[in-house]
Amino acid sequence: IRNLKEEKIKPDDDPDKNEPVTMKLAKFLLSTADEPRPQDLHKMLEDILMELGVKPSAEKGLLGELQKLDVVGDSSCLPSGSNSSGKSTCNCLKEKGTRKCDCPRSYTDRTSNWGWDPYHEVFYFGDRFYQHLFAGNKHDLPLHVSLGPASEVDYTLCPKDFDRMLKTFREHNFHVNITGAGYDKGVDAMGDYFYFMEKNIPVAIPLNKRRAKNLKDGNLNLSSNAIPLCKAGKEMRRHYFKKEQMSHVYCCPIKRGSRKNGEFRYVTHREECPLDTLCEPDATLAPTVQVCTKDNPRFYPVIPRGSKRYKKLAKERTGTERSNSFKKWAYSFDKAQLKSRAHRLIRLHLLAVIEHRKAMFKEETRGLSKDKIVQLALKNMEIN
């Protein structure tokens, strides 16, 4: 018996307000990283996905180089199949003739609650699932799936799911080296950047538009992509990254390298300067600015926003949308009318296994005729 009207609260996506929560969660996950997974339903389903999906796909080369693995993640809303209005437990209808009262009501789905769907801009009753996957080799292959209440947001769902994924890999002796991770602005929180920095995993995360204007870092003005601005207000040019110090060096945006007659030199494009002047005419690259990732991993991530590496991960992140669509619409998740979180979690993992199996079958039948494909399908089904 609950009063869900009181639970209808639109989540605040302001990174500053969420920073204490995400930092606390990040420190907790880091401190418990070596602990085993709890013996629960989720662990059983993770093991099934690993043995029937992830490992076979890796053996067939569908996950690419495991020592240079890029992952992407995203969440999606999952409405409950139960009645969001619940069942009345009071006598307001008989005594007052009121159908829509504010009294607590009884709900079939005890674990679901109200959450905000930012895409459709509506409240919904149910859960929110998060998944990490590999989007490459023309396939979108889930690596891990988790499920939380609808009221939970990506700020916390993402690091939780990533932590469970790493633990699952470790307990299955699945040795991978994650070299990059791509997310959307829902993970733009200082605690999440801190978590991935401590894990030594470069991330590609766009800045939340709510705070992407008039950015400042001390006396340094920044663009909407958190790139230092010169005196003329132009984004400075990233010169190089000092890996040992985890710092980026930016230089004058109108002084760029050029090659002429086989000789490399720096050329000053004075006509591009809004101030029509040179701040330091005698210098090859100056003025220069050096910013450190450790000082502010949100403003200065290892993967700069707008770089080729960033754009590659952003493009791969669209694979999560295709995978989410496959689970929810291709297999009509809503028509299943599942009324418990456990049933929804089971279905999500079985669909994830199907995604792997479809990719493997597609690779096995590439270039085959229709007759041979049918024969192979019958053989796999053990039908004579």
Q: What does each model-found stretch correspond to?
A:
Residues Y310-N384:
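Basic, amphipathic alpha-helical segments enriched in Lys/Arg and hydrophobic/aromatic residues
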Residues N137-D140, H144-S146, Y193-F194, I201, ...:
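Extended accessory and catalytic-adjacent subdomains in large enzymes
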Residues I1-K5:
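Non-catalytic DNA-binding core/recognition domains of DNA-processing enzymes
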Residues E6-E198, P206-N208:
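Polybasic low-complexity intrinsically disordered regions
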Residues N219-Y250, P297-K339:
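Short amphipathic alpha-helical "interface-anchor" segments enriched in bulky aromatics
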Residues C92, R99-C103, G115, C251-G306:
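Long, low-complexity, polar/charged, intrinsically disordered or flexibly structured peripheral segments
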Residues V153-N261, P304:
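An internal, acidic/charged active-site-proximal segment
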